């Protein structure tokens, strides 16, 4: 995997999906023609699928396009200009914002935090992922607003879990 792009073997695993849909009726889900714009929070069928996989409610899922980095950027941008649901003010009005960056990590994640001027706090990565003892200590700082996290599990290539302080 380079720069978040799946390798040939990963792409080959889903090649058969390109020929599954053979009739326009196959493109309708819950009355929505999926060849066109769907619901803002994502297709209901996709939300049900991922809710089952993630063990949550469909209404707790947001299904976006295939570029998760865009969703990440949009979320950070909104927090920067407007704050989050429990924020007292937009992050741009705070004295400082810190973001936990497991290293090695994904350069495009780092570019987002860098472009907003966040202090990037390096978190070492063990064979099991970020050193969670370090993360648990660092999130005690109220200036820490998030952590980049790259997961590799079935159906989820990239996911940024944002830890809101």
Annotate each PLM feature.
Residues 2-30, 140:
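Conserved N-terminal helix/loop that builds the PLP phosphate-binding region
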């Amino acid at each position: 995997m380079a720069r978040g792009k799946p390798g040939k073997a990963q792409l080959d695993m889903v090649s058969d999906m390109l020929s599954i849909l053979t009739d326009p009726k196959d493109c309708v889900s819950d009355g929505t023609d999926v060849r066109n714009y769907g619901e803002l929070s994502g297709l209901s069928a996709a939300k049900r699928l991922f809710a089952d996989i993630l063990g949550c409610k469909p209404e707790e899922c947001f299904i976006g396009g295939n570029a998760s980095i865009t969703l990440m950027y949009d979320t950070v941008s909104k927090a920067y200009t407007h704050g989050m649901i429990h924020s007292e003010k937009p992050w741009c009005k705070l004295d400082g914002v810190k973001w936990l960056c497991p290293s090695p990590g994904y350069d495009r994640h780092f570019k987002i935090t860098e472009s907003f001027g966040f202090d990037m706090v390096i978190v070492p990565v063990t064979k099991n992922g970020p050193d969670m003892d370090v993360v648990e200590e660092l999130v005690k700082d109220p200036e820490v607003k998030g952590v980049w996290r790259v997961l590799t599990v079935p159906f989820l290539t990239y996911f940024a879990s944002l830890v809101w302080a």
